[in-house]
Amino acid sequence: MALSRWLEQARAMLGAPGLRAIDVDASRWRDVAQDVAAAGGRLLALWGGRTRDTDRKVVMLVLLPDGALVVTLALDRALERVPGIEDVFPSATRMQRALYDLTGIRTTDPDTRPWLRHAAWPAEAFPLTTRELPTPPSRPIDDYAFVRVEGDGVHEIPVGPVHAGIIEPGHFRFSIVGEKVLRLEQRLGYVHKGIERRFTELPILAGHRLAARVSGDSAVAFAWAYCQALEGMSAVRVPPRAAWLRALALELERCANHLGDLGALGNDAGFAFGLSQFMRLKEGWLRATERALDQRYLLDFVVPGGTSADLQADGASTLSQAVRTLEPEVRKLREIYEEHAGVRDRFLATGTVAPELAARLGLVGLAGRASAQAFDLRVDLPCEPYASLEVTKCVHDAGDVLARVTVRFDELLASLRLVETILRGLPPGDHAAVVHAPAEGSSGIGLVEGWRGPVAVALEAGPDGGIRRCHPHDPSWNNWPVLEHAVIGNIVPDFPLINKSFNLSYSGQDL
């Protein structure tokens, strides 16, 4: 059945623009996935929950060339396992494993190893299905069955979960011959915090604060996606000024992260000068953000109905001056990076993900655009005010560290121009509207292009102004598996550089 047949049956869904939804039974679950893949679509997120106290469901959110589709499978009590889609969308494997860890819903995926459960609860307990928190088991931590690579001269290097430096934990198991990487297998989930369960304990009008803390470097993106879903469910139209202020905050966040990454990438290539210069620029950018909007990282700037504060004339002047100061310095540092033979040698042809592989694995966001995956929600599924702005889609086709650095430079400069455009075109009016709790059972999904890639928040209203279910999705879910492929054939000392060129979130993945 062609994708068009499914779309003809689909209904509009609340939240992000371009969203459609369809309900299917188990016999058609894989058919939809296969038709989406054949049409050039890709899986963004997969999660499970309850439609009522006893009924269970599984949901997948797929991105299409001209929209997004939410596919819901209500589970028949007689259905023992949901048909797996890991052969259609390889990124589904970890999502399906997490689905079982949290809800007890098993798929036919042959990989049944735990993903988020690190012996914090018994194997037979599922945190999203009971009111009481499961008791931690008294038995030792489960052994995790890494895939073994055997052969002459092959040995393993375990790295982590505790790393040097101030970063979150993750385990990397390298199988190597000499210094050459034959295989990398990741073990994540060490910072699982029970975020999805915590959402169900909060009022729906306060959930945006937790959403902003799913992955702290993407606070604006997650808070906006949450509020976008909530506002759609509540039939609230955000004032134009509020929408423009949100876009301003999102681009400020994008610039700050790109500045930090470009410095760190220089450092990982042995160019400490790059780190010191970009950290200086990032600090100046954060200080300007704080002077203009009273927060460095804008954790609580986006609120239901708009923003928590307005931008005053002196704040706009501060940001405009920051752009004029920053842009020429970024251009000069770009020249230095491009002309430095040692840096270029480390970046070029390192950690390559060919466009064909990127498409097959579902690489998204900045890393995807560096491998010719030309999708950007700000252009392809724009919410206001992006539909009114001329957003440059920055794409490269080499797929190596150099390409990911190039896309960062391009996006940084493009975002600086966007900030100036927003400051000049900021409409008058209110910066927030009143939002009331939506009716029980209503649902919506927010979609926002964060600096790392597409951020999604699926929200369902519960009784008495509460939350029945909330699933926040970080693009790191899609991109962590691709990193395992990017390092194959490279040498072990290049892994920190390759890893940083993706700069994926542990917290956003681990929930």
Model-inferred region functions:
Residues 1-180, 343-346, 350-353, 359-361, ...:
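Terminal low-complexity/charged segments
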